């Protein structure tokens, strides 16, 4: 399967990491450091491409932690919550930092607000997922992710899972062409659509 692209990288790195004395939570922590490094670099003029590379590394490790947990039979409830928390922090920091950087470069505070709106949308999605997963017992379902069936399912799956899974590559390409500022209006709108789609029945059942 071609998509998500990030899986092609993580599936090659995971066997290497599996031979090392590292735990899934340690890999998640390193992923967090790469994600925060991306946020810091994205604020600095001229460092966006390096920041994009940091985000790709963050995403690769974010996939490796779950794969390692499965291989080593080390899946835990805490690990799942930690992974979700790190995902939220990285994306919130990314959009907030991008807004700060573009606002400082242009002198226009509207970019700052777009960054904060996108970050706030990510926070709503995190809290909503935490509440809904706890209510539905999604983490204990044990049936695994289901495949989309109808048109509505595919729309939700593509937007919530496929775009999210390969978002790092979108950032990297935009950074190479100095177009990361376009992610601010897209993120400010998309982050709200993302958590609204979380309310669609069965949206939380899809995973890539």
Whereabouts are the PLM-identified features?
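Transmembrane helix-loop junction
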Residues: 19, 70-71, 100-104
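Membrane-embedded alpha-helical segments that form the functional core of polytopic membrane enzymes
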Residues: 24-78, 95
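Membrane interface segments of multi-pass transport proteins and intramembrane proteases
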Residues: 15-22
């Amino acid at each position: 399967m071609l998509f998500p692209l990030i899986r092609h990288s993580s599936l090659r790195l995971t066997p290497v990491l599996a031979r090392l004395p590292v735990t899934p939570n340690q890999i998640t922590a390193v992923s967090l450091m790469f994600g925060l490094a991306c946020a810091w670099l994205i604020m600095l003029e001229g460092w966006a491409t390096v920041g994009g590379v940091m985000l790709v590394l963050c995403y690769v490790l974010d996939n490796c932690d779950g794969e390692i947990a499965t291989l080593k039979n080390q899946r835990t409830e805490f690990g799942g919550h930690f992974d979700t928390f790190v995902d939220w922090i990285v994306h919130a920091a990314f959009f907030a930092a991008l807004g700060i950087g573009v606002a400082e470069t242009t002198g226009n505070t509207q970019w700052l607000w777009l960054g904060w709106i996108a970050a706030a949308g990510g926070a709503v999605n995190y809290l909503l997922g935490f509440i809904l997963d706890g209510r539905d017992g999604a983490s204990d379902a044990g049936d695994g992710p289901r495949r989309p069936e109808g048109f509505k399912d595919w729309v939700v799956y593509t937007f919530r899972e496929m775009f999210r899974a390969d978002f790092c590559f979108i950032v990297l390409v935009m950074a190479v062409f100095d177009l990361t500022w376009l992610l601010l209006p897209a993120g400010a709108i998309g982050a709200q659509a993302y958590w609204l789609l979380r309310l669609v029945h069965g949206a939380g059942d899809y995973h890539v």
